[in-house]
């Protein structure tokens, strides 16, 4: 069964469960999406192993007086390598809507289901759920690898600790956040190459541009960007906290705001945008 046949079978006001099913079929039928996400998981599990090895070497060479500040998760969950995951997730989210624009499927969808905002809500929910599952796999796998490598020196962190729960939750939510942001950009822009460029600018260049200005408001703006608050939420020690770093509650607030605003933009823009 194709996405077109599912949408054509709807008449009048479709039930949300039908819309969820249709959007899921469209999501998994996107070319190369499954391969891209599988490759993303494999790459980050490999990077987790390399990062854990680096953390182990740092711990071995660290003077005793500095060890209390050691962050056992930083080698895996810290650093700019996570920007790749953000770009991939944002691009996948964007293509869930720009691909429909290029094929004309979006017009067929709105012909079958005129209530555009219900379609948009279903698309947001399916995209977020799928990317959360991928994020959870990466988070759990990376954490397990890190624990395995570091447990021999008794420097790992307990699974039940508040830091671990926060770290796993933030990592699991990073991909759906970026996917929804990409979906919002794709809904507004409507062109795949331009949207991918916008995703890269938003997630990579904008945070560094804000930080380079070094004024109070630009620092606050930089802290509100996904990479910044993700980095804060994945810190499990004190060694990587510097001046101007936002608090954990502020980081969670920024994350929730990004999720909410992205979904609102998708639902609003899809209601008025020409297709």
Where are these regions (language model features)?
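Secretory targeting signals
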Residues: 2-13, 33, 37-94, 120-188, ...
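A short amphipathic helical element positioned immediately N-terminal to and/or at the very start
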Residues: 16-28
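Helix-capping/transition residues at the boundaries of transmembrane alpha-helices
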Residues: 26, 98, 109-111, 182, ...
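Helix-loop interface residues and adjacent transmembrane-helix termini in multi-pass membrane transporters
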Residues: 30, 113, 188-189, 272
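Residue-level recognition of membrane-helix boundary sites in multi-pass small-molecule transporters
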Residues: 31-35, 105, 118, 194-195
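Transmembrane helix segments
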Residues: 46-50, 192-228
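Transmembrane helix boundary and interhelical loop/hinge segments in multi-pass membrane proteins
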Residues: 90-112, 116-117, 124
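Membrane-interface capping segments at transmembrane-helix boundaries
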Residues: 267-275
């Amino acid at each position: 069964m194709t996405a077109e046949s599912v949408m054509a079978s709807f008449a009048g006001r479709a039930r949300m469960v039908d819309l969820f099913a249709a959007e899921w079929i469209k999501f998994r039928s996107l070319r190369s999406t499954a391969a891209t996400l599988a490759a993303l998981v494999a790459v980050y599990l490999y990077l987790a192993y390399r990062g854990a090895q680096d953390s182990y070497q740092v711990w071995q060479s660290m003077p005793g007086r500095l060890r209390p500040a050691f962050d056992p998760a930083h080698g895996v969950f810290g650093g700019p390598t996570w920007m790749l995951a953000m770009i991939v997730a944002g691009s996948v989210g964007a293509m869930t809507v720009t691909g429909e624009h290029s094929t004309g499927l979006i017009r067929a969808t709105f012909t079958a289901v005129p209530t555009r905002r219900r379609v948009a809500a279903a698309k947001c929910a399916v995209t977020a759920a799928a990317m959360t599952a991928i994020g959870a796999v990466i988070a759990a796998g990376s954490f397990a690898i890190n624990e395995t490598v570091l447990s021999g020196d008794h420097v790992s962190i307990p699974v039940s600790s508040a830091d671990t729960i926060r770290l796993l939750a933030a990592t699991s939510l990073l991909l759906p956040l970026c996917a929804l942001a990409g979906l919002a950009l794709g809904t507004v822009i409507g062109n795949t190459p331009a949207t991918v460029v916008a995703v890269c600018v938003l997630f990579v260049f904008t945070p560094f541009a804000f930080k380079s200005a070094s004024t109070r408001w630009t620092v606050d703006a930089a802290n509100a960007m996904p990479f910044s608050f993700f980095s804060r939420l994945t810190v499990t020690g004190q060694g990587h906290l510097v001046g101007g770093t936002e608090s954990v509650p502020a980081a969670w607030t920024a994350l929730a705001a990004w999720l909410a605003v992205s979904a609102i933009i998708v639902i609003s823009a899809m209601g008025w945008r020409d297709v």
